[in-house]
Amino acid sequence: ENKWIKKSDIKNIHHYEKNYIKVFKFFLNTKYLWGGKTCVGIDCSALIQIYFYYNRIFFPRDTKDQIRFCKRKRSKNQLKGDIVFWKGHVGICLNKSRFIHAYGPKKKVLIMPTVQTIKLIDKTANLKVKKVSNISNI
């Protein structure tokens, strides 16, 4: 069977993708795989790291190193582009009400309500938010 690639899907090898929402949504429903960093399987820290990789910006691979690397945000309110860190977990706010992460218990990358996600992780994993940074501060 013949398969075709649309010309609009082909990117120059030097292409940068500044639209982080587009990058993260590309992985929506991708299987959660601890240590994975492809569309076959990905974990939470790789999901965040891959945006920076696409833009030729260094960003650590593991959540604990990402926490040390990122600057703390001053505001307590979650906003578009906020990277939320827990011990061993990370995700990003697509806007103030929607949050995307590679979520182990659901076994895939998914979008969830921001506030409910923070409460759910606190309740089910007994984890408090360690740090919030913003993608624009990297």
Which residues fall in each region the model found?
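Boundary regions of SH3-family modules and the immediately adjacent low-complexity/disordered segments
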Residues: E1-T30
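Short alpha-helical interface patches
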Residues: S8-I10, T114-T124
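Intrinsically disordered, low-complexity proline/serine/threonine-rich regions
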Residues: Y16-K22, F26, G35-K37, Y54-N55, ...
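Terminal peptide-recognition signature
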Residues: F24, L47, G81
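Catalytic cysteine-centered active-site loop
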Residues: K31-Q78
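...with weaker cross-activation on analogous glycine-rich loops/strands in unrelated enzymes
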Residues: F58-Q116
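Low-complexity, Gly/Ser/Thr/Pro-rich intrinsically disordered linker/tail segments
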Residues: I121-I138
